[in-house]
Amino acid sequence: MAFLLTTRRLVCSSQKNLHLFTPGSRYISQAAAKVDFEFDYDGPLMKTEVPGPRSQELMKQLNTIQNAEAVHFFCNYEESRGNYLVDVDGNRMLDLYSQISSVPIGYNHPALAKLVQQPQNASTFINRPALGILPPENFVDKLRESLMSVAPKGMCQLITMACGSCSNENAFKTIFMWYRSKERGQRGFSKEELETCMVNQSPGCPDYSILSFMGAFHGRTMGCLATTHSKAIHKIDIPSFDWPIAPFPRLKYPLEEFVTDNQQEEARCLEEVEDLIVKYRKKKRTVAGIIVEPIQSEGGDNHASDDFFRKLRDIARKHGCAFLVDEVQTGGGCTGKFWAHEHWGLDDPADVMSFSKKMMTGGFFHKEEFRPSAPYRIFNTWLGDPSKNLLLAEVINIIKREDLLNNVAHAGKTLLTGLLDLQAQYPQFVSRVRGRGTFCSFDTPDEAIRNKLILIARNKGVVLGGCGDKSIRFRPTLVFRDHHAHLFLNIFSGILADFK
């Protein structure tokens, strides 16, 4: 097992990184091969093309049971560790995608391995309770040690779920209940409401809506899919709701050269948000809430300014709409702050905030006023998993103890600077470099070139992800450090130099 392997410590020299850029040269860094993290490998090791023969055979077998066309390769998770993912053919790759941004502190972290092995934790991993009715004795303590210790400003209430989609789906329900409760006032449910809700009719099922943005991704369940607008294949053939969809800013880069253009673009989008709220109120499909990602991820790593989000928050407040921030992909530290919305600098950033991925469990925080008025209104069998809360508490301890948020900010600056250097050297392949922390991306000329670059990088020992129509995104772990950035930049510079 990887976590039983003898740990290693190789200390980085203090020599400054050396960047050499001449016409036609490749990115060179003397720091690229340095290792300073005790359970990491020292670099990629490739034995076959990926997917290799064993992966291909397993893909054929899986395809007899389900559609396996999305599978990239099969993994050996016992041998994977740190920032490196090992496949079943023995290929060791620097993983900058980290299970679609869901691995917080690397593979097989020794502290988590130790936690799993402790006898007092065995029952937590063996028994999965129905938390809504039969929680374990230590459930409250573990919530306080884990999720409540990083609760966003103004949100003292928490409901745990299993994934990002069910987190947003139930957040929508919470918003609808809150909005109807405001309209209803102190009186209870009427007989008509109780009867009509059973046949999907108003007033029991009011025609409320959630406003979302083009390019957004909020999940694949029915309500979430109505607010997801990133790829047609996610939505085709699925019935949906008549809910408003606003344009999300499409910023021009470099930002400092297009300040006025980008301000006008954001103003246009905000104006459309207000127009849609008014329009849907007149259509009797009142906008009960607005959902937005701090950075549109699946839709192409689309950014907006902090000022845009502050003004959007004001619009929600002005029109009495709940403001739901989807931190499923941006949360957990990858932007250099624990929650990406902290960059906005607001004392009242949101009414509801959803999370998952790096948080190891799903769920949403919310203000006291959004608390469901009765049991079973927001409910399912498991309501998350106590074992994930146990692991998350240790992850948060490690983030604090090892100052990983500052590490993300520093490593992210190294990565972003290197990408900007590559953009200057290979503008025909790399454009619109952007990012916050290690949450970085760039555009390629088209989808075909993007996909080819990702495949070549994988065969060179680097796992990358795509997003949007033609973007490459970076989603490394929080233990991704400067030397990992330099290692990637050296490899990718060589790929670009040879690309045809």
From Swiss-Prot:
One Pfam family recorded for the sequence: Aminotran_3
Source species taxonomy: Eukaryota, Metazoa, Chordata, Craniata, Vertebrata
Protein name: 4-aminobutyrate aminotransferase, mitochondrial
Gene: Abat
EC number per UniProt: 2.6.1.19, 2.6.1.22
N6-acetyllysine modified-residue sites: K252, K279, K318, K413, K452, K470
Subcellular location: Mitochondrion matrix
Organism encoding this protein: Rattus norvegicus
Modified residues (N6-(pyridoxal phosphate)lysine): K357
PROSITE patterns found in the cross-reference section: AA_TRANSFER_CLASS_3
